[in-house]
């Protein structure tokens, strides 16, 4: 009987997993040539989004401006946090990457995934990518799972669609995938044969994570995967993501409204507001030296900051109302809520400015 292959990267006995190493660099630290560095950078670029716009038609000539020129990249093995409040465009971005937007959506821009513009692919070609090369972990696992099918069969079905395997092997792989995410057989119960309503919220989330990982995709999009979970279960799921990250080269876009979830987890963070990336930086720099006024306000709002407040002092909030997606502004979208705005912020839109090699901010305060 065939033993089900593990979901983790295949390594020779005694070999150590190696990620993000530059070809030409020896174990003894010999420096590579500039050509090798450039070749590695091109090879490591997995996803590149350039000037992505998404608008929805609402009838009567009205439009909703959901994404307004997003540019973003993700390299192989990198965890990129997508941070923003409700309505900032996070979930629209996830659906745009998978081409799952409704027919009312008008999409423009460029999405390069492993060198191919996914916006120009046929639906048949896109079906070969969804679930196999790019996988989605939704924020509502209870709605994503089919209530009348066994959990294991739903994971196995992903393999049946994308692999030329018989059903027996698909089931064996699915069982292995469930075990990888902590849904272990035993105690008189097999999670493979359970139905969604028989699982807790955390177990359902583990099941959809198994669905996403079973084909070993190059890119995983986690759309607020802990939003519907209690605090204890949320911590368990985050620990699971950290464990799964070790030993695999998949890239992860982790979408959240909570900056604390990205701490000690993400490599880089892109902060979204009104359908635009307003700041990108390393996760350490995000907590130590945030620049954009919206990003600073968002960090000040998280519950973890409550411990720093004096007795009777109120938790910080961002004043004003979020930007109206149906009414695009002439200037900076955050200007009506910004305490640091300049006169030109009302009438001109800042450009993204590189602060250094790892950081960029869209704000006139930094030369935008």
Predicted regions, residues:
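Charged, flexible cofactor/metal-binding loops and thiol motifs
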Residues: 1-40, 188-189, 282-368
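P-loop NTP-binding/switch modules centered on Walker-like glycine-rich loops
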Residues: 13, 229-310
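Conserved ABC transporter NBD signature motif
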Residues: 106-117
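Conserved ABC ATPase "signature" region
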Residues: 117, 169-190, 299-300
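Conserved ABC ATPase signature
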Residues: 190, 194-199, 203
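A short, proline-enriched helix->beta-strand linker immediately N-terminal to the Walker B motif
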Residues: 214-218
């Amino acid at each position: 009987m065939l033993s089900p292959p593990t979901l983790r990267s295949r390594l020779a006995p005694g070999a150590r997993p190696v990620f993000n190493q530059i070809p030409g660099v020896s174990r003894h630290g010999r420096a590579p040539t500039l050509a090798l560095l450039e070749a590695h950078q091109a090879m490591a670029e997995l996803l590149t989004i350039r000037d992505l716009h998404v608008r929805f038609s609402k009838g009567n000539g009205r439009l909703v401006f959901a994404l307004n020129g997003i540019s973003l990249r993700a390299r192989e093995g990198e965890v990129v946090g997508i941070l923003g409040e409700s309505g900032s465009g996070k979930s629209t971005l996830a659906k745009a990457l998978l081409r799952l937007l409704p027919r009312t959506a008008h999409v423009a821009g460029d999405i390069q995934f492993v060198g191919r513009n996914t916006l120009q692919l046929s639906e048949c070609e896109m079906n070969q990518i969804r679930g196999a090369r790019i996988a989605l972990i939704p924020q509502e696992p209870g709605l994503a799972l089919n209530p009348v099918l066994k959990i294991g069969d739903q994971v196995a079905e992903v393999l049946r669609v994308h692999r030329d395997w018989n059903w027996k092997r698909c089931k064996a792989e699915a069982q292995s995938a469930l075990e990888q995410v902590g849904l272990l057989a035993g105690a008189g119960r097999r999670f493979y044969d359970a139905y969604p309503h028989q699982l807790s919220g955390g177990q359902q989330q583990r099941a959809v994570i198994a669905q996403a990982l079973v084909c070993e995709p190059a890119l995983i999009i986690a759309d607020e995967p802990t939003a519907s979970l209690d605090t204890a279960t949320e911590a368990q799921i985050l620990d699971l993501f950290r464990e799964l990250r070790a030993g695999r080269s998949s890239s992860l876009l982790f979408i959240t409204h909570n900056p604390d979830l990205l701490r000690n987890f993400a490599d880089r963070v892109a902060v979204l507001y009104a359908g635009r990336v307003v700041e990108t930086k390393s996760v350490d720099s995000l907590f130590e030296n945030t620049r954009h006024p919206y990003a600073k306000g968002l960090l000040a709002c998280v519950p973890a900051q409550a411990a720093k407040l004096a007795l009777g002092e109120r938790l910080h909030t961002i004043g004003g109302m979020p930007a109206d997606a149906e009414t695009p502004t002439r200037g900076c979208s955050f200007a009506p809520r910004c305490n640091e705005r300049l006169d030109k912020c009302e009438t001109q839109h800042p450009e993204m400015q590189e602060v250094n090699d790892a950081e960029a901010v869209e704000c006139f305060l930094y030369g935008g």
